Amino acid sequence: MTHQLKSRDIIALGFMTFALFVGAGNIIFPPMVGLQAGEHVWTAAIGFLITAVGLPVLTVVALAKVGGGVDSLSTPIGKVAGLLLATVCYLAVGPLFATPRTATVSFEVGIAPLTGDSAMPLLIYSVVYFAIVILVSLYPGKLLDTVGNFLAPLKIIALVILSVAAIVWPAGPISNALDAYQNAAFSNGFVNGYLTMDTLGAMVFGIVIVNAARSRGVTEARLLTRYTVWAGLMAGVGLTLLYLALFRLGSDSATLVDQSANGAAILHAYVQHTFGGAGSFLLAALIFIACLVTAVGLTCACAEFFAQYIPLSYRTLVFILGGFSMVVSNLGLSHLIQISIPVLTAIYPPCIALVVLSFTRSWWHNSTRIIAPAMFISLLFGILDGIKASAFGDMLPAWSQRLPLAEQGLAWLMPTVVMVILAIIWDRAAGRQVTSSAH
């Protein structure tokens, strides 16, 4: 007999999914986009919500449909390419960007206002921070219970208070949009949504949500998909409400900070302005705990993944990943964001193509014929977009600037659509040939 979840269990699954997604990036990027977009904040918000909410939820649903992790999702592109994709996802949400970012965000919100942005305080902080991360990651047994029962609700309560405050007590009038947002607010919001890395995170952690439903006795594929979809939608609604409030917070904070300020600085300035020193201390403590929990979760997940393929023990990998993340974190938050933008701009398009096209797998004679070329083309043109967003943008040939949507950082979109159409024609033709030869 198939076990069905009670309403309480479904809500708990939704909260767990929301808590998995809400990390450092989710809190710092919406205020930054809000401040820079100014009067175009809601146009930018729509673009941001597509990549920072829509795509991660879609990824969770796609994983539930195939009943597994990123390895199941990437079946149409083959084992080697699938492993490469999984490795890129784990590196991005692990030691390259997301894990170091947890340290820099908690430092900038809690410590930098007291010490300034000099290198030595960050170095000392990062050594202590990652020593704790490594220690907890070596013995993660009780972490999940602690997170689920105490820290996740605390984090959600703090975010609700912050969101309500942003709406009820705006810091000042809306700022004027930066040049980048005057003509391309939607696409800038869309590309900035990449920076939350939630789609990559969903590929890594989506299986956790599916397994959480399984652990409660749900075995039927149809019900697993349904419950995971509900959990994803609940998390999506929560993220949307949080982001809209944080966009409002950022767009109203022009009188508090410079428009080039990063999200952590905006957040600290607003909380200091609205709640005073005690509020700032509470915010710093909560963000420290939230970031630490995220860092431990990412370190554990990455160590478990790489232990399957590298002849090193889990414990050794925890030390390596923690040490590497510590070194990277000393670049500082603003530099880390600058470096991550070109890389994420390059690797997001093939992930988007894979997730969206995974829903069409049953439509084709051979889904590999559609998905593999679409991902390849989206990666090629995504790399062009990535180079354009980097310091090497001037080295690109003139024709790359004339591609459709190139100005918006979405040069990959039209070539990928064209490739999908050509691949569909090929699949239909090749499929008919196979059938006729069989008879």
Swiss-Prot record:
It is found in: Cell inner membrane. InterPro entries: Brnchd-chn_aa_trnsp_Livcs. Residues 1-9, 65-79, 140-149, 211-226, 299-316, 360-369, 426-439 are cytoplasmic. The chain crosses the membrane at residues 10-30, 44-64, 80-100, 119-139, 150-170, 190-210, 227-247, 278-298, 317-337, 339-359, 370-390, 405-425. GO terms for cellular component: plasma membrane. It is a multi-pass membrane protein. One of its GO terms (molecular function) is L-leucine transmembrane transporter activity. Disulfide bonds: none annotated. Residues 31-43, 101-118, 171-189, 248-277, 338, 391-404 are periplasmic. Keywords: Amino-acid transport, Cell inner membrane, Cell membrane, Membrane, Transmembrane, Transmembrane helix, Transport. One of its GO terms (biological process) is L-leucine transport. It comes from the Bacteria. The keyword Membrane applies. The keyword Membrane applies. Belongs to the branched chain amino acid transporter family. NCBIfam families: livcs, PRK15433.1. PANTHER family: BRANCHED-CHAIN AMINO ACID PERMEASE BRNQ, BRANCHED-CHAIN AMINO ACID TRANSPORT SYSTEM 2 CARRIER PROTEIN. Liv-II branched chain amino acid transport system, which transports leucine, valine and isoleucine. This is Branched-chain amino acid permease BrnQ.
